[in-house]
């Protein structure tokens, strides 16, 4: 006799980590910058193995010092400095954070090397901060030169905060540059804003499980009375895909086939772009009578 398994309902979009945990991925040849409070813990996971990590720390006094982690340096931080001198995205974020806090990359002169080229996959090193500090975890390595040695690989950093986030408190990703404007769009509402050529627009689902509609119009033509927005047919035809995505096929076009927007990053990956807006009938048929919907909004 086959005994059926007890199944649990699956609720997509719920946070996988607790209110005191944060998960970061350190790209090969990249870094991640952490702001730590007293009592915060973090661990570095060597995902594929054979990957060295370098740990740099700034104390609350602004000095490059590993004492907040109760560690003594065994290296001079050159590997991390070389990474931060590049135009790699995580390096720009680190430089932005350090600049706002008044720290200089040139002041990095102490670090500790974690793991080695012989470290096994999923090896873990754990640390705890006893003071306010800024820590940089980097995954140094050469480019993929297969005839010399293994290429650099990713590291995972999991932070356990001493203070849990309160209900309604959210954690935002680090901005690349100083934000020009931040808009909090409340539920059931919409917001309009004007951007210049070259500006970046970042839409963040703060709490998860929230759909959003995005529309764009050419401001100059709109002032002339021409309402030219994102065109479904031209965007799909010129990009050769159901919806644009980062990479070669990344642009949205208007009715005259002029490029309007380019997708730079997409952590969702699946969208109902150019789909029909939801209506009250859609929810009525499902039994949710009077549910707010895009068409009524």
State the predicted function of each range:
Residues 1-297:
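Intrinsically disordered, low-complexity segments enriched in small/polar residues
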């Amino acid at each position: 006799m086959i005994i059926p398994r007890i199944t649990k309902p699956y609720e997509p979009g719920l946070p996988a980590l607790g209110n005191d945990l944060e998960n970061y991925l350190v790209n090969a040849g990249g870094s991640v910058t952490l702001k730590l409070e007293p009592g915060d813990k973090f661990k570095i996971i060597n995902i594929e193995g054979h990957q060295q990590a370098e740990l740099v720390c700034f104390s609350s006094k602004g000095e490059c010092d590993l004492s907040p982690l109760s560690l003594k340096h065994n290296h001079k931080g050159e590997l991390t400095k070389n990474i931060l001198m590049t135009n790699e995205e995580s390096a720009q974020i680190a430089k932005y954070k350090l600049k706002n806090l008044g720290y200089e990359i040139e002041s990095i002169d102490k670090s500790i090397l974690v793991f080695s080229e012989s470290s096994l996959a999923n090896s873990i090193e754990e640390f705890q901060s006893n003071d306010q500090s800024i820590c940089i975890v980097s995954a140094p390595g050469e480019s993929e030169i297969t005839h010399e040695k293994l290429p650099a690989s990713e590291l995972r950093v999991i932070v356990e905060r001493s203070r849990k986030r309160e209900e309604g408190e959210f954690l935002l990703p680090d901005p690349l540059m100083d934000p020009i404007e931040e808009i909090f769009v409340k539920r059931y509402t919409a917001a309009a804003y004007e951007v210049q050529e070259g500006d970046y627009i970042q839409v963040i689902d703060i709490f998860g499980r929230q759909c959003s509609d995005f529309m764009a119009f050419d401001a100059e033509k709109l002032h002339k009375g021409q309402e030219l927005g994102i065109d479904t047919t031209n965007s799909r035809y010129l990009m050769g895909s159901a919806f644009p995505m980062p990479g070669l096929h990344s642009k949205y076009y208007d009715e005259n086939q002029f490029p309007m927007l380019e997708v730079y990053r997409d952590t969702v990956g699946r969208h109902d772009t150019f789909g029909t807006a939801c209506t009250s009938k859609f929810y009525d048929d499902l039994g949710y009578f009077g549910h707010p919907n895009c068409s009524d909004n």
